[in-house]
Amino acid sequence: MGFFDPYKGFGVTFSTMFKKPTTEQYPEYKKETAPRFHGRHQLNRHPDGLEKCVGCELCAWACPADAIYVEGADNTETERYSPGERYGSVYQINYLRCILCGLCIEACPTRALTMSNDYELADDSRRDLIFTKEQLLAPLAAGMEAPPHPMRLGSSETDYYVRDPDAPLPWQVTDEQRAAAGGSDSSTDRAADVIDRRTAGEHSRADEVPAHGAGSERPR
């Protein structure tokens, strides 16, 4: 050990005194996350409250940590939870295993699963870190109805995915607007326009429920 070695160590300590601290006074002050931060998952809903999850289990197959468990079930005319033939009756995410990689989000064909800005997942109970469907479902927004209930946006599953996201919802259209339209149904024309815009990469996602947490609606 040389004579000047201790002074070199003091120099490193002295230089760090002028650097911006990287720690936060948590939980009094919380660090703002990036807009596309990979936090806790959320199961999204359609504008009428039906669930977007169709119980296909692709997210569970894509998970490299085997953290997702899904059980699908069939919808009936008396009990409908999603527009499709099936829905996710059981949905669990084990955050003791989850690595928050986002591969499940990419695998989801209906945009039912997204990731929020919520990162507060610490707990003193292993059981409480296995989130159930009720914990992951997005809260009901204005105009939504808790399932089960019939389809409100159309008569088939296709109406939910080809409709214009920027168009008013059926229960938002006034009698005056219907009269001005001459009573004609232009849903076919709107659907064709939506398909053309999505093909051109100009699609809108205004109908997605904003994720929980610090951020508002997440860019997609």
Curated annotation (Swiss-Prot):
Gene that encodes the chain: nuoI
Segments of this protein annotated with the region Disordered: 164-220
GO BP terms, alphabetized: aerobic respiration
Top-level division of the source organism's lineage: Bacteria
Catalyzed chemical reaction(s): a quinone + NADH + 5 H(+)(in) = a quinol + NAD(+) + 4 H(+)(out)
UniProt cofactor note: Binds 2 [4Fe-4S] clusters per subunit.
Organism this protein belongs to: Frankia alni (strain DSM 45986 / CECT 9034 / ACN14a)
Taxonomic path: Bacteria, Bacillati, Actinomycetota, Actinomycetes, Frankiales
UniProt-recorded name of the protein: NADH-quinone oxidoreductase subunit I
Compositionally biased residues, Basic and acidic residues: 187-220
Gene Ontology CC entries for this record: plasma membrane
Primary location recorded for the protein, binned into one broad class: membrane
Binding site for [4Fe-4S] cluster 1: C53, C56, C59, C108
InterPro entries reported for this sequence: 4Fe4S_Fe-S-bd (IPR017896), 4Fe4S_Fe_S_CS (IPR017900), NADH_quinone_OxRdtase_chainI (IPR010226)
Domain 4Fe-4S ferredoxin-type: 43-73, 89-118
Pfam families membership: Fer4_7 (PF12838)
Membrane topology: Peripheral membrane protein
UniProt keyword Oxidoreductase, yes or no: no
EC number(s) on file: 7.1.1.-
